[in-house]
């Protein structure tokens, strides 16, 4: 095991710039081991040097076990490739791997971050430095020259090649795309700061015999937009995020809206405010991206979401949080990656969670061909545009809402039905279907579950 010394801060002003879509590209193996946290008193400003009053040693073990120096046991999960969260002895630690603005990152050191008890009644500041492995690596995708201000060129032959290459789905030209720059389309697909590669190897859990037995009687198809028992649909209308990279906020709000309707038997039917998340969340980067685990999960539990009428959606990052502390908010609790930790998610668990508790956010890798999707069961093609001599549409991570699954009656292909946030004119009236059972584009890796608080 390796020693790592970290800085954990509770100051929101610092957090705003450190909590989501960083250039870090770290793995389970990087986080696994023995970490030492130095803790100090709460301060109103980020300290350059912390007067540490105590330290805590926490060991992160396989697959999701956390044990502190006193023998208390808890759990932990990697947060994509950006950091991890530990819950132990009624306290939560949010750790984001250290990085610099030039794209350098260090998987054995943290940025200033949060620690607070699970009741959010008391918080602390802690800081530290790396003991060993004090080496920064470069994420070449982050901050690379991208010609981002160039207007996107629609190449009709590219769409034609997509349709000729395969028959599972059909692409279509959306003329409005030519009005946007490459950076604006990146924002729409996840945000310029989500241009990070998915870990090549996940600490993935395969379905157990018990799980296979438990899910053996699940229906062949299920769709919350049209429940099979004829009941009301809890799925709220399609949103259009515009060119703001707020996709992480839309499915987080939509999932909470749906689950509140189900738990309350439709006695409560809020339409929540993703704009509040864009303006106020210390766990994301406004219009530059974020992750549902930190929004539907942590932000929903720590801060809650007010209704849309409080802060309507503008698709802009104002940088100012104007929400009254006294407004009614809807909260989440008991959030986690499906399966308990990042890497534990699989198809069967996703089906079970979907049917049992309602729609939930997922993330997946967006390639250039996806923006031209019109209908059918999407899978990434190897077709490349020949207009540019570089790849202008670098890989991003896009968050969406899983609402159903089924099997195509013509092709026999299994699929997930997913709600996007690009308006009703895109795809299948705002939805798309994507290949199920193969972790296509990572769609079976980032499912997030939570319970609504009523």
From Swiss-Prot:
UniProt subcellular location: Lysosome
Q: What is the superkingdom listed in this entry's lineage?
A: Eukaryota
Which GO molecular function entries does the Swiss-Prot or TrEMBL record give? cysteine-type peptidase activity
The record ties this protein, via PROSITE patterns, to: THIOL_PROTEASE_HIS (PS00639)
Q: What is its main location?
A: other
Which residues of the precursor form the propeptide? 21-217
Q: Name a single GO cellular component.
A: lysosome
What biological processes does GO assign it?
proteolysis
| Keyword Ligase applies | no
Which positions form S-S bridges?
Answer: 26-107, 244-287, 280-321
What cofactors are annotated for this protein? chloride
- The residue range of the signal peptide is 1-20
What is annotated as the active site?
A: 247, 398, 420
**Keywords, ordered alphabetically:** Disulfide bond, Glycoprotein, Hydrolase, Lysosome, Protease, Signal, Thiol protease, Zymogen
Question: Does the record carry Transferase as a key word?
Answer: no
Q: Explain how, and how many, cofactor molecules are bound.
A: Binds 1 Cl(-) ion per heavy chain.
**Sugar-bearing residues?**
25, 265, 326
- Cited InterPro entries: CatC, CathepsinC_exc, CathepsinC_exc_dom_sf, Papain-like_cys_pep_sf, Pept_his_AS, Peptidase_C1A, Peptidase_C1A_C
Describe its function: Thiol protease. Has a role as a digestive enzyme.
Family the UniProt entry places it in: Belongs to the peptidase C1 family.
> Entry's PANTHER family?
CYSTEINE PROTEASE FAMILY C1-RELATED (PTHR12411)
- The name of this protein is Cathepsin C
């Amino acid at each position: 095991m390796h020693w790592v010394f970290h800085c954990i801060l509770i100051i929101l002003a610092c957090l705003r710039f450190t909590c989501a879509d960083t250039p870090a590209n770290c793995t389970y193996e990087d986080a696994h081991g023995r970490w030492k946290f130095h803790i100090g008193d709460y301060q109103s400003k980020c300290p350059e040097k912390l007067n540490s009053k105590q330290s805590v040693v926490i060991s992160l073990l396989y697959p999701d076990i956390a044990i502190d120096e006193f023998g208390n046991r808890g759990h932990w999960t990697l947060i994509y490739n950006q950091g991890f969260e530990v819950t132990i002895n009624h306290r939560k630690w949010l750790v984001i791997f250290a990085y610099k603005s030039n794209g350098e990152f260090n998987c054995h050191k943290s940025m200033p971050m949060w620690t607070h008890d699970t009741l959010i009644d008391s918080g602390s500041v802690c800081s530290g430095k790396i003991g060993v492995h004090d080496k920064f690596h470069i994420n070449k995708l982050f901050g690379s020259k991208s010609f981002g201000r160039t207007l996107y060129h629609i190449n009709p032959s590219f769409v034609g090649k997509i349709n000729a290459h395969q028959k599972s789905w059909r692409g279509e030209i959306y003329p409005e795309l030519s009005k946007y720059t490459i950076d604006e389309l990146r924002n729409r697909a996840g945000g310029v700061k989500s241009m990070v590669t998915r870990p090549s190897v996940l600490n993935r859990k395969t379905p157990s015999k018990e799980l296979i037995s438990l899910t053996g009687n699940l229906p062949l198809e299920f769709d919350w937009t049209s429940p099979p028992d004829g009941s009301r649909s809890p799925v709220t209308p399609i949103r259009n995020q515009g060119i703001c990279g707020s996709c992480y906020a839309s499915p987080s709000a939509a999932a909470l809206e749906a689950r509140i309707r189900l738990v309350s038997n439709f006695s409560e039917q809020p339409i929540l405010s993703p704009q509040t998340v864009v303006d106020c969340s210390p766990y994301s980067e406004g219009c530059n991206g974020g992750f549902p685990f930190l929004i539907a999960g942590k932000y929903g539990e720590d801060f809650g979401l007010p209704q849309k009428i409080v802060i309507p959606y503008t698709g802009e990052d104002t940088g100012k949080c104007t929400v009254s502390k006294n407004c009614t908010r809807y909260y989440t609790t008991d959030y986690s990656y499906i399966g308990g930790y990042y890497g534990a998610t699989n198809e069967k668990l996703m089906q079970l969670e979907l049917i049992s508790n309602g729609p939930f956010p997922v993330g997946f890798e967006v390639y250039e061909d996806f923006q031209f999707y019109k209908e059918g069961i999407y899978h990434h093609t190897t077709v490349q545009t020949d207009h540019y001599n570089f790849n202008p549409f670098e890989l991003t991570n896009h968050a969406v809402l899983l609402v159903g699954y089924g099997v195509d009656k013509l092709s026999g292909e299994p699929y997930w039905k997913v709600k996007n946030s690009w308006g009703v004119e895109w795809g299948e009236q705002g939805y798309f279907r994507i290949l199920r059972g193969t972790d296509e584009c990572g769609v079976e890796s980032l499912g997030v579950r939570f319970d609504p608080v009523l």
